[in-house]
Design a protein with these regions (language model features):
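Short, acidic, metal-binding catalytic loop of nucleotide-sugar glycosyltransferases
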Residues: 25-35
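A conserved acidic beta->alpha catalytic loop
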Residues: 42-51, 73, 97
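Conserved short acidic donor-positioning loop in nucleotide-sugar-dependent glycosyltransferases
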Residues: 15, 27, 43-44, 75
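Conserved donor NDP-sugar-binding/catalytic core segment of glycosyltransferases
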Residues: 106-139
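Glycine-rich, basic loop-to-helix element that forms the pyrophosphate-binding segment
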Residues: 70-88, 110
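Catalytic core of nucleotide-sugar-dependent glycosyltransferases
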Residues: 187-189, 210, 214-218, 223-252, ...
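Conserved nucleotide-sugar donor-binding catalytic segment
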Residues: 86, 126, 143-227
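Short aromatic/hydrophobic "clamp" motif used to bind/position activated sugar donors
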Residues: 93
Length: 301
């Protein structure tokens, strides 16, 4: 492994006592010919996640350097993510949430080799399967990924890239796109934003092979019942992304915000949540003129 570029893996955990061991097992089983830096950050889980982590880390393979932090105070998912990224020293970067896991022992080597051999690419990802108590989701693909290049607009329009499937160049963290779109600690989501930032460095490749599992459960950050506060934060992120990238991404951003706000406005109104309904109404009024102009231009063409 001497002379090989290092790969950093960011793992965030919170209340993952039932899952974190499987996440670490998927990392430790990787067959690679390069050094690994594991950056594991537990956000002061009130359950036994910390104890499970400490016990499992005793079996760390020799080629993996562990940087484990258990925060003294709960930071929240996004500040915890920013904290973890500041620890990255590898030239490549991978992710695995504490409740997801990798299923293929050659996952990292496959993606590492691709980026080493194809310098024009900055990021690659693969297919993942859902693991869920809901039969309509369990065992099915998170999204259908093809062996081809993907565009920034594609991954923004359609939620196709799951975080645990990605390996990217860590130079992404030094791009203007990263600095401009991922500097707000109140953001609820950060995965799509960092994937888009990577595409400012180079191309993006998809692999059809399934090499990880996405655990979908009600406690997950991006899965569960309708959450109006979450949707307001999603509007905020879409605004940041649209304002930076402009063009078709900006058009889609405006459309997403309008549709989400329109639907949530009527739902909150029916539920008597008038203050929240008013917040969605402000988003609607802010974007409907832009959408009318956009639709008129499209009709003319």
């Amino acid at each position: 492994m001497q002379g090989k570029k290092k790969l950093s893996i960011v793992v965030l955990s919170y209340n993952h006592q039932e899952y974190i061991e499987q996440a670490l097992e998927g990392i430790f089983m990787q067959k690679v010919d390069f050094p690994i830096e594991l950056i594991l950050c537990d956000d002061k889980s009130p359950d036994n996640t910390h104890e499970v982590i400490e016990a499992y880390l005793k079996n760390t393979p020799p080629h993996i350097e562990v940087k484990y932090t258990r925060h003294e105070q709960n930071m929240g998912s996004t500040p915890n993510f920013y904290y973890a990224l500041r620890q990255v020293t590898g030239e490549y970067l991978a992710f695995c949430e504490g409740d997801d896991y990798w299923t293929d022992e050659h996952k990292l080597q496959t993606q590492y080799d691709f980026l080493e051999q194809n310098l024009e690419y900055a990021i690659c990802f693969h297919q993942a399967n859902n693991v869920s108590p809901y039969s309509e989701l369990d065992g099915k693909p998170f999204s259908i990924i093809e062996d081809r290049d993907y565009t920034p607009l594609e991954i923004y329009q359609h939620w196709v890239v799951h975080t645990a499937t990605v390996v990217m160049r860590s130079a992404t963290l030094r791009t203007l796109a990263f600095k401009e779109t991922l500097n707000d600690p109140t953001l609820q989501y950060f995965d799509t934003a960092i994937f888009l930032a990577a595409t400012t460095l180079g191309k993006m490749q998809g692999f059809s092979k399934t090499m990880s599992a996405y655990r979908r459960h009600d406690a997950g950050l991006s899965f569960g019942a309708v959450n109006f506060r979450r949707d307001l934060k999603h509007n905020h992120l879409d605004t940041i992304i649209g304002n930076f990238y402009q063009g078709k991404i900006k058009q889609h951003s405006d459309w997403q915000i309008f549709i989400r706000s329109y639907n949530d406005f009527f739902q909150t109104l029916k539920q008597g949540q008038f203050a929240t309904a008013f917040q969605f109404l402000k988003w609607i009024l802010k974007h409907y003129k832009k959408l009318i102009i956009y639709l008129l231009k499209k009709i003319r063409h």
